Regions:
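N-terminal secretory signal peptides that target proteins for export/translocation
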Residues: 1-2
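Bacterial N-terminal signal peptides
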Residues: 5-16
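Hydrophobic alpha-helical segments
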Residues: 14-211
Length: 211
């Protein structure tokens, strides 16, 4: 019996000292709600997703454990995507940088596909960590990236960075970009805390395409 207890304690200790990335590979911390769920709200959530042309992703199946909140949250995501005037390419660029800074691997992976379909190049995406030294970005894109960096910093957005945004975007567009960066930064925290893992190549194109 003592030997069994010591083995369990040792195993727990190994998990506790594992790097975050290794722990995340263990999979989601909460159940993935399946299609045959008896919860009518979760069923409604999945039905709405399929009506939009995508199968429920792991993110949605985790959210399905709190389906009413999930539907409200995803309604915000839909509004950010489709009810905005700022270009999809600019939105995807700030989302990529915001999720990268928030270490949201799940969201970054999904939006990488979206960004490419919106005209962001693979070379640009790969150079995001060193974007300040890159010649691949326009002045407009550099203003967006600097804004994302400032939003994620402890110091916040300074006047010079905000003024650079005003040179390319009107007030509504700046608010839309700000909300996209903030929303997906928060979503990244959720996916990290709950260890939401990628699906590989999901049916329905993941988060969709630039349309």
């Amino acid at each position: 019996m003592l030997r069994v207890i010591l083995s369990v304690v040792a195993a727990v200790g190994v998990v506790a000292t594992m790097p975050v990335a290794a722990q995340q590979s263990a999979g989601p911390r909460v159940p993935l709600v399946q299609d045959d769920t008896s919860d009518p709200d979760a069923q409604a959530l999945f039905k709405e997703l399929r009506a939009r042309g995508t199968s429920p992703l792991n993110l949605h199946r985790v959210y399905g454990n709190a389906p009413k909140l999930a539907r409200a949250t995803l309604a915000v995501a839909q509004a950010l995507r489709y009810d905005a005037i700022v270009s999809r390419a600019d939105k995807e660029l700030i989302i990529l940088r915001a999720t990268q800074l928030a270490r949201g691997d799940y969201q970054f992976g999904q939006h990488r596909r979206l960004a490419i379909s919106c005209g962001i190049t693979v070379e640009q995406i790969d150079s995001l960590p060193q974007w300040r030294d890159s010649k691949l970005f326009s002045d407009r894109q550099r203003a967006v990236l600097a804004y994302a960096d400032a939003m994620a910093s402890a110091q916040g957005v300074d006047d010079a960075t905000f003024d650079a945004m005003k040179a390319f975007f009107n007030t509504k567009e700046i608010i839309e970009l700000t909300m996209n960066a903030a929303y997906y930064s928060a979503s990244s925290q959720i996916s990290r805390a709950l260890r939401i893992t990628a699906e590989g190549n999901p049916k329905g194109g993941g988060y969709g395409t630039c349309r």
